[in-house]
């Protein structure tokens, strides 16, 4: 895959930049798509698989010539979007928990190392951000205010935290300031973003106040899952909230919720005015969704309709990546849940099974 030289350096004119792009701090997403952080799912192997599908669908002028990072316009270029790690607990990172340290060691082929943090203590969050930035472990840091899982919200974290406005402001401000201070040793300032829901429930809608406070604190973008914490993943995402948020803030807004096919992303951007989309459950067992997203967002009519044989090849590729990352035994255990997702809707028996 080849990348024109002008995409490896600061462009001399706007016409040389990709037309479908969003800026996250100093970084450029040439395709406005983000793989959502998902616990137990978005490890390095799955992120790489999704990115491989996404980059295979890029227009010729955006296809990278090699793996790894692409300096561009004072930051980094992510041709096919952003692929975020699993949620990392700030305290575990500060305490140098071995499993957590493994989670933040990203694939060396990644274009832009994006790590999501979860925590409820501003001081610990600042320390965790400092570690990631000073030790050159991340190029982008996202803060989790969207997790609806009870074991997280019961502690006042995740999607319950924005209701505690003073704590929310302290956490975001601590992260942004820590990133700025630690970035002095880096070639660019590592941006901090947030991901949140519209509120705890219909009686406790928090997203607009939280977004304005986060923007004032200096975040570089805001992702909104258009459901309440109470909804978890039930019902339909209420995209109109994304549009309201976009009109309320000046930083980029990424919409999340009910992106199942490539055309859903196009529709979300058209109906909400959002700058990009975040994809979660829609890609479980369907990493080729990222090829369809790239095709759709760059105006190509091509879509992916894999038969069972093609799906089995994807499973093999996924298994190989996992085996290299965590060893064959753990890879087999990790792959089991993915196989159930992969084979949903297919009649499987005999040799394939």
Q: Whereabouts are the PLM-identified features?
A:
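N-terminal small/glycine-rich loop or linker at the start of catalytic domains
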Residues: 25-32, 91-112, 147-157, 182-198
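Alpha/beta enzyme core
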Residues: 58, 123-157, 161, 165-251, ...
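Active-site beta-loop-alpha junctions enriched in small/polar residues
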Residues: 38-40, 88-90, 118-120, 146-148, ...
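A structural motif
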Residues: 55, 80, 137-138, 219, ...
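Glycine-rich, positively charged N-terminal anion/phosphate-binding segment
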Residues: 7, 16-23, 38-135
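Hydrophobic faces of well-ordered beta-strands that scaffold small-molecule active sites
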Residues: 33-37, 83-86, 113-117, 139-141, ...
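Alpha/beta catalytic cores of nucleotide-metabolism and tRNA/nucleoside-modifying enzymes
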Residues: 1-29, 33-34, 39, 45, ...
């Amino acid at each position: 895959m080849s990348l024109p030289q002008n995409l490896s350096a600061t462009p001399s004119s706007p016409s040389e930049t990709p037309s479908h792009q969003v800026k996250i701090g100093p970084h450029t997403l040439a395709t406005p798509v983000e793989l959502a952080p998902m616990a137990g799912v978005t490890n390095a192997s799955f992120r790489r698989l999704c990115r491989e599908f996404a980059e295979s669908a890029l227009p010729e002028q955006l296809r990278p010539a090699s793996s790894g990072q692409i300096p561009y316009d004072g930051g980094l270029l992510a041709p096919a979007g952003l692929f975020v790690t699993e949620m990392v607990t700030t305290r575990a990172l500060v305490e140098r928990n071995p499993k957590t340290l493994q989670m933040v060691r990203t694939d060396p082929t990644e274009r832009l190392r994006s790590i999501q943090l979860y925590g409820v203590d501003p001081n610990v969050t600042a320390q965790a951000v400092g570690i990631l930035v000073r030790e050159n472990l991340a190029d982008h840091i996202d803060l989790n205010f969207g997790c609806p899982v009870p074991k997280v919200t019961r502690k006042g974290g995740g999607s319950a935290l924005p209701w505690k406005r003073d704590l929310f402001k302290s956490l975001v401000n601590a992260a942004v300031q820590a990133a700025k201070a630690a970035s002095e040793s880096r070639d660019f300032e590592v941006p901090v973003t947030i991901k949140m829901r519209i509120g705890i429930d219909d009686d406790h809608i928090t997203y607009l106040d939280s977004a304005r406070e986060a923007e004032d604190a200096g975040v570089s973008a805001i992702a909104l899952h258009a459901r309440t914490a109470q909804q978890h993943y039930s019902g339909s995402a209420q995209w109109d909230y994304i549009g309201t948020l976009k009109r309320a803030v000046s930083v980029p807004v990424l919409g999340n919720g009910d992106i199942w096919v490539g055309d859903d992303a196009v529709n979300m951007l058209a109906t909400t005015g959002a700058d990009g989309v975040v994809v979660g459950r829609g890609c479980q067992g369907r990493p080729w969704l990222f090829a369809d997203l790239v095709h759709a967002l760059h105006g190509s009519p091509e879509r992916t309709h894999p038969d069972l044989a093609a799906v089995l090849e994807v499973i093999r590729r996924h298994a190989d990546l996992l085996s290299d990352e965590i060893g064959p035994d753990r890879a087999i255990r990790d792959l089991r849940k993915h196989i159930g997702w992969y084979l949903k809707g297919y009649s499987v028996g005999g040799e394939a099974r």
